[in-house]
Amino acid sequence: MYGPKDHGWIEVVAGPMYSGKTEELIRRIRRAEIAKQKVQVFKPEIDNRYSKQDVVSHAGDKIQSVPVKSSKEILEKLLDDTDVIGIDEAQFFDDFLVEIVSKIANNNRRVICAGLDMDFKGEPFGPMPKLMAIAEFVDKIQAVCMVCNNPATRTQRLINGKPAKKSDPVVLIGAQESYEARCRKCHRVPR
């Protein structure tokens, strides 16, 4: 994941909830800070589960971030001397994020995006599939299925302890009260 200083690139960390995507983003950003690189982290304003300002993992790790309403706002708030850009919860941004991330990487910067690759229905989520396609480095990580303990690649939404229906809205900000990590076999989406 390291290249010449005169080249930019895109890294994507994808997987279901509770797989450690945000922890990995924070780890990579902290390593860049140790290397004396200038970093900026962005997150969608709607992600206010644990903090309005910080990016916070389910495990409690956190790092300062800039909440933005849209992907275009990332360009507006990006400082000229930033070397490494982190973007958490990338799935919540519009498809314009793909163009913005490409533009930033084309300007010799490292961009790290973390997000859910699939929604609770098991379908590609937001700009993540396109980001994964254009990225130089993609890490698809797994959680542990909360039913059978096998590797989990999906996010199960629960409503009153039961699987959400296919007709339910895609975006619902929540944590353990609303979601579980599930494997392919244990994941359910009733019609």
UniProtKB/Swiss-Prot annotation:
GO CC term, one of those recorded: cytosol
Listed EC numbers: 2.7.1.21
InterPro entries, alphabetized: P-loop_NTPase (IPR027417), Thymidine_kinase (IPR001267), Thymidine_kinase_CS (IPR020633)
Keyword list, A-Z: ATP-binding, Cytoplasm, DNA synthesis, Kinase, Metal-binding, Nucleotide-binding, Transferase, Zinc
One Pfam assignment: TK
Domain of life of the native organism: Bacteria
Active site, UniProt feature: E89 (proton acceptor)
Compartments reported by the entry: Cytoplasm
Biological processes, Gene Ontology terms: DNA biosynthetic process; thymidine metabolic process
Molecular function terms from GO: ATP binding; thymidine kinase activity; zinc ion binding
EC category name: transferase
Cited NCBIfam families: PRK04296.1-1 (NF003296)
Protein name: Thymidine kinase
Lineage start: Bacteria, Bacillati, Bacillota, Clostridia, Eubacteriales
